């Protein structure tokens, strides 16, 4: 009787391990490809403001580099900076609003190359968020890779170049690109637009008031992308 019971139990276990549901679950886990991550950093003049003695721009650069280095092996990372040319006066608006610099194209993370790509850039001009999102979309369109597609937009302000970032974020979401927004020491009046960008982009809006806040957000996101 005991022999028969053991045989039945073993048969049931074997069936469970070879069932279509188990096989599908195993295949899905094994087949999950690394993510493709684009970080868009605001280099408008207001990012020069210092918090605890460090400019918001430099704080953001440091935390973005730590975030990129913590991503799972095989993750394709891209870094763009927007508004880094011209100046934040009317005389420099046209140049600044056209300034989307793809400083680190989609590739695996290399710390030295990543840091070098940002060495000569500082906070200068206006805030062309829509154009930066559109440039990210074009980069994803040219990327031949599997895995989820995720954008992290870090800014301290709203669109100032006449674009429509909410409409653009919606276009990214149609292409299955998730848009997350980090509002870094932003003016309260900008929250509506930043939150709307994340909402239509299928992502989340994260308020950050200090470098420590930015660090916590990126740590959380790195853990999520590692699952």
Swiss-Prot record:
Entry annotated with the keyword Signal: yes
Highest rank taxon of the organism: Bacteria
A Pfam family the protein falls into: VWA
Signal keyword on record: yes
VWFA domain mapped to chain residues: 36-227
Leader peptide range in chain numbering: 1-23
Protein keywords: Signal
Family: To B.subtilis YwmD.
Protein name: Uncharacterized protein YwmC
Lineage: Bacteria, Bacillati, Bacillota, Bacilli, Bacillales
Underlying gene: ywmC
């Amino acid at each position: 009787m005991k022999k028969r019971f053991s045989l039945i139990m073993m048969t049931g276990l074997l069936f469970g391990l070879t069932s279509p549901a188990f096989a599908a679950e195993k295949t899905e886990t094994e087949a999950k490809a690394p993510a493709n991550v684009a970080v868009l950093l605001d280099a408008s003049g207001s990012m020069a403001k210092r918090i605890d003695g460090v400019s918001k721009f430099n704080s953001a650069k440091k935390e973005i580099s730590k975030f990129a280095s913590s991503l799972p092996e095989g993750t394709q990372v891209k870094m763009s900076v927007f508004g880094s040319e011209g100046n934040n006066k009317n005389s420099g608006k046209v140049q600044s609003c056209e300034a989307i610099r793809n400083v680190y194209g989609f590739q695996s993370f290399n710390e030295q190359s990543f840091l070098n790509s940002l060495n000569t850039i500082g906070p200068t001009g206006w805030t062309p968020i829509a154009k930066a999102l559109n440039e990210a979309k074009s980069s994803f369109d040219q990327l031949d890779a599997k895995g989820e597609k995720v954008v992290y937009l870090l800014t301290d302000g709203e669109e100032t170049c006449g674009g429509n970032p909410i409409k653009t974020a919606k276009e990214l979401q149609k292409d299955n690109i998730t848009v997350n927004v980090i509002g870094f020491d932003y003016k309260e009046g900008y929250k509506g637009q930043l939150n709307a960008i994340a909402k239509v982009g299928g992502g989340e809006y994260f308020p950050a008031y200090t470098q420590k806040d930015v660090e916590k957000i990126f740590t959380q996101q790195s853990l999520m992308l590692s699952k």
